[in-house]
Swiss-Prot record:
Acts as a processive, ATP-dependent zinc metallopeptidase for both cytoplasmic and membrane proteins. Plays a role in the quality control of integral membrane proteins. This is ATP-dependent zinc metalloprotease FtsH. The chain crosses the membrane at residues 46-66, 148-168. Binds 1 zinc ion per subunit. It is an enzyme of class 3 (hydrolase). The lineage of its organism: Bacteria, Bacillati, Cyanobacteriota, Cyanophyceae, Nostocales. One of its GO terms (molecular function) is ATP-dependent peptidase activity.
């Protein structure tokens, strides 16, 4: 599998507001606010009333508590005397009530016992009872039994009260949530403390300068109003994922020192009709109350897509939300003092009314960083990491074209994890190399065992690297490896020496030729019947490149023509499928030109490999033994094997 460069694709909180209803009454010419009684207070009042109603029933139904007969009593000292005089027949001790029931000798059988109030310590009484052989024992009082009965009754009542409170609370929460659906879920910070400053943002200097000016607008508006300048109402950050759009918004919030609202585009629309528009109104109402302020809407394409028919009829609620957003941003009333910052990676799907000046006055492109930007980003993210002095950040920046800021941060983090796993004290170039491979191609797999399959893969990968090295218009080879990563059994890496914004026809043909060289090497060594499915991904890539050369870039015998329209988004009311603005005859010619380009490049790769069969075998033996050949060593071996005949052939191929 040949890897040329990173491909970058464009992909595409919440606090409930609370409302307290009030009743306004006129009192001596002044307005007095009377809070409506809360449902929770009503619930507790009802529970208390129910308990008070039940208590008389519980206590009234207990005859022991309702009736208390007056009984004869003795003092504690008198009881001791009667025990000494052997006048006591039996004593019942009630430790709970701290009383003793005394039965005297000669007392009538139906006479009630005499009650005596006990002390906390009754050891003397018990010793005297034992000495005089008086019968005594412990009993439980009627009051203790009544307490047990009360607890049993409460065991039935408390669950009922708790259940009633639960139902009341749920009904209260349901009504409260229903009233709060229309409230904005934007997170509000009076002075946002994000921990991010403009010094923490690197690699996107142009975008940073634009947004620093917005902060200056907020802090020193007189500098601009003095010359008649108007504060921009909106700034749209556009760029692929991972380039730092949200990081820039955090930096603005940390630098501006003004109230800051942040919300995601998906937090506007809910399941209920009208909620989205209501939340937009509530958001801008709060913003006007705190002006001057900033509003950050992340992923605005979730609510700002183009209005149109699309497929189905379920997009009307989103359109209402967008219409309300357009009105609030630049409608009849205006929103002086509010600056809106939005971020998206799908600017092509946004409604044109949203993008016009007066709503989003500026569109700031936040693209993947160049070499200088990548170096600055690596310097920022390496501040808190232990990096070996031998590691060159500039070399890392050169070998990572197409990497975004998020990719570079992840790269250094993976290198730090590998360093800790290997129990090293600092990150070395070995961990950096492994981290790059892991980020681009995936996890490292189990090494291949020595077999025919391993040697076949070695021929395939050496074919890519050898042809790419022989063609002068091709990017230099960086590494050829047999270590499996992700879905690939082997990998060949090519890294450009410089940033390439434009690609020539000869460069495209060189890439097609080297990509086909893997299949060509298999056919030369093992024969056409033994070619494998390993070149399937390579064939898809070269077919796509060749077709684009013919239909999009005008690099074929058909002339400088663009023959295919871009596919539209069906859910935006655009084309259902690609439109072909040419006849069947032209379509046949397109197919013929695509086949001609691919076949020509395939024959070129076969000729180069056959001419350099000796060096190919040498490289395959070395790769099978070491499993990885670095780019410098690979190019050195190829240059040592060059001869005048090969050089003459290469000059002819490169001139085609």
């Amino acid at each position: 599998m040949a890897i040329f460069a990173r491909r970058i694709g464009l992909n595409q909180h919440s606090a409930y507001g609370s409302r307290q209803r009030v009743i306004v009454m006129k009192n001596f010419g002044k307005k007095a606010l009377i809070k409506q009684q809360s449902p929770k207070r009503v619930a507790w009042t009802g529970a208390l009333a129910a308990s008070l109603i039940m208590l008389p029933t519980m206590f009234g139904g207990n005859p022991v508590l309702a009736q208390k007969a007056e009984r004869e009593s003795l003092s504690y000292g008198e009881l001791i005397q009667k025990v000494n005089q052997e006048q006591v027949k039996r004593v019942e001790l009630d430790e709970t009530e701290q009383i003793a029931k005394v039965y005297l000798k000669g007392q009538k059988p139906d006479a009630p016992p005499i009650q005596v109030r006990l002390l906390e310590q009754n050891n003397e009484l018990i010793n005297r009872l034992k000495e005089k052989n008086v019968d005594f024992g412990e009993i439980s009082s009627a009051n203790s039994r009544a307490a047990v009965g009360l607890l049993i009754n409460l065991m039935w009542i408390l669950p009922l009260v708790a259940l009633m409170l639960l139902f009341l609370r749920r009904s209260t929460n349901a009504s409260s949530q229903a009233m709060n659906f229309g409230k904005s879920r934007a997170r509000f910070q009076m002075e946002a403390k994000t921990g991010v400053k403009f010094d923490d943002v690197a690699g996107i200097e142009e975008a940073k300068e634009e947004l620093q000016e917005v902060v200056t607008f907020l802090k020193q508006p007189e500098r601009f109003t003095a010359v008649g300048a108007r504060i921009p109402k909106g700034v749209l950050l556009v760029g692929p994922p991972g380039t730092g759009k949200t990081l820039l918004a955090k930096a603005i919030a940390g630098e501006a020192a003004v109230p800051f609202f942040s919300i995601s585009g998906s937090e506007f629309v809910e399941m209920f009709v009208g909620v989205g528009a209501s939340r937009v109104r509530d958001l801008f109402k709060k913003a006007k109350d705190n002006a001057p302020c900033l509003i950050f809407i992340d992923e605005i394409d979730a609510v700002g897509r183009q209005r149109g028919t699309g497929i189905g009829g379920g997009n009307d609620e989103r359109e209402q939300t967008l219409n309300q957003l357009l009105t609030e941003m630049d409608g009849f009333e205006g929103n002086t003092g509010i600056i809106i910052i939005a971020a998206t990676n799908r600017p092509d799907v946004l409604d044109s009314a949203l993008l016009r000046p007066g709503r989003f006055d500026r569109q700031v492109i936040v693209d993947a960083p160049d070499l200088k930007g990548r170096l600055e980003i690596l310097q920022v993210h390496s501040r808190n990491k232990k990096v070996d002095p031998s590691v060159s950040l500039e070399a890392i920046a050169r070998r990572t074209p197409g990497f975004t800021g998020a990719d570079l941060a992840n790269l250094l983090n993976e290198a730090a994890i590998l360093t800790a796993r290997r129990r090293k004290e600092a990150i070395t170039i070995l961990e950096i190399d492994d981290a790059v491979d892991r980020v681009v191609a995936g996890m490292e797999g189990t090494p291949l065992v020595d077999s025919k399959s391993k040697r076949l893969i070695a021929y395939h990968e050496v074919g890519h690297g050898l042809v790419g090295t022989l063609l002068k218009d091709h990017d230099p080879v960086q590494k050829v490896t047999l270590i499996p990563r992700g879905q690939a059994q082997g990998l060949t890496w090519f890294t450009p020496n410089e940033e390439q914004g434009l690609i020539s026809r000869s460069q495209l043909k060189a890439r097609i030729t080297s990509t086909l060289a893997g299949r060509a090497a298999e056919e030369i060594v093992f024969g056409k019947p033994e070619v494998t499915t390993g070149a399937g991904d390579d064939l898809q890539k070269v077919t796509s490149m060749a077709r684009q050369m013919v239909t999009k870039f005008g690099m074929s015998e058909l002339g400088p023509l663009s023959l295919e329209n871009q596919s539209g988004e069906v859910f935006l009311g655009r084309d259902w499928m690609n439109k072909s603005d040419y006849s069947e005859e032209i379509a046949a010619k397109i197919d013929s030109q695509v086949r001609e380009i691919i076949n020509t490049c395939y024959q070129t790769s076969k000729e180069l490999l056959q001419t350099n069969r000796v060096v190919m075998e040498r490289l395959v033996d070395l790769l099978t033994e070491q499993e990885t050949i670095e780019g410098d060593l690979f190019r050195k071996i190829v240059s040592e094997s060059q001869n005048p005949v090969v050089d003459e052939q290469l000059s002819m191929v490169n001139s085609q």
